[in-house]
Swiss-Prot record:
HAMAP family per UniProt: RNA_methyltr_E (MF_01547)
Name recorded for this polypeptide: Ribosomal RNA large subunit methyltransferase E
Localization (cell): Cytoplasm
Binding site for S-adenosyl-L-methionine: 51, 53, 69, 85, 108
UniProt-listed Enzyme Commission number(s): 2.1.1.166
Catalytic activity line of the entry: uridine(2552) in 23S rRNA + S-adenosyl-L-methionine = 2'-O-methyluridine(2552) in 23S rRNA + S-adenosyl-L-homocysteine + H(+)
Gene3D superfamilies for the chain: Vaccinia Virus protein VP39
Pfam family, one: FtsJ
Described function: Specifically methylates the uridine in position 2552 of 23S rRNA at the 2'-O position of the ribose in the fully assembled 50S ribosomal subunit.
Top EC class of this enzyme: transferase
């Protein structure tokens, strides 16, 4: 899928292919290029509604999937869905109970943007840090993280935090991202983890 595709073209293709949103192709593109999700991985999807990434994940892994969002997610067979804010400790406890072993965390979440560039960028960075902290507390050693972000102020500081926790970190643009957008994805592989955390070392 070339970058010359318009938003309407990709939207129509998503509808034809049965995906709930055009963002499905972003995860397909990322996994084809970086092999983030393996056949038996258990995956948590943060900001999962309407569920297009969960639809794609079902084709990539036979492992358990869990989608979390502030908005209800239309159910998918054999997929756990949790409605709530993943930054809320009570919701995090529910996720841990449902998913005791997690290989991959994906996050396509983005705050509602106001149009005030500095304010919006600060909120994006805050959400990214929350997702990174969540992944760090849940992933097993060697696990992977895919997280949407936007390049701007404080992005390099965020990237430095990710590099402290993963052995391999790349910043990429999906071929499905609209031309001119500052949207990017952080693809972080091989979570360093905590050598003293036996739960994270389990296969």
């Amino acid at each position: 899928m070339g970058s010359q595709w318009t938003k309407d073209n990709v939207y129509r293709k998503a509808m034809r292919d049965g995906y709930r949103a055009r963002s499905a192709y972003k995860l397909i593109d990322i996994n084809e290029r970086f092999n983030v999700i393996r056949q038996t991985d258990n995956v948590v999807d943060l900001g999962a509604a309407p569920g297009s990434w969960l639809q794609v994940l079902k084709t990539m892994t036979e492992g358990q999937l869990c989608g979390v969002d502030l908005n209800p997610i239309i159910p998918l067979e054999n997929v756990i869905t949790i409605t709530g804010d993943f930054t809320d400790p009570a919701i995090q406890a529910k996720i841990r109970e449902a998913m005791p072993l997690v290989n991959v965390v994906v996050c396509d979440a983005s705050p509602h943007l106001s149009g005030a560039k500095a304010y919006d960028q600060a909120r994006v960075m805050g959400l990214n840090e929350e997702a990174l902290n969540f992944a760090s507390n849940l992933l097993k050693q060697g696990g992977n993280l895919v997280m949407k972000s936007f390049q701007g102020s404080d992005f390099n500081e965020l990237l430095a935090l990710v590099k402290e926790k993963f052995y391999s970190v790349r910043v990429i643009r999906s071929t499905a991202t609209r031309r001119g957008s500052t949207e990017c994805y952080i693809v972080a592989k091989n979570f360093i983890g905590d050598a003293d955390d036996d739960r994270k070392k389990r296969e």
